From Swiss-Prot:
Keyword vocabulary terms for this entry: Amino-acid biosynthesis, Branched-chain amino acid biosynthesis, Leader peptide, Leucine biosynthesis
Function of the molecule: Involved in control of the biosynthesis of leucine.
Gene name in the database record: leuL
Protein's UniProt name: leu operon leader peptide
Keyword Amino-acid biosynthesis: yes
Cited NCBIfam families: PRK09925.1 (NF007397)
Native source organism of the sequence: Escherichia coli O157:H7
InterPro entries tied to this protein: Leu_leader (IPR012570)
Length: 28
């Protein structure tokens, strides 16, 4: 189960980073 949680965590981090880049790109 731990590997599943870590995998989901990585997906969430990637999604948040992509959103942050998109938002920052739009703002700039």
């Amino acid at each position: 189960m731990t590997h599943i949680v870590r995998f989901i965590g990585l997906l969430l981090l990637n999604a948040s980073s992509l959103r942050g880049r998109r938002v920052s790109g739009i703002q700039h």
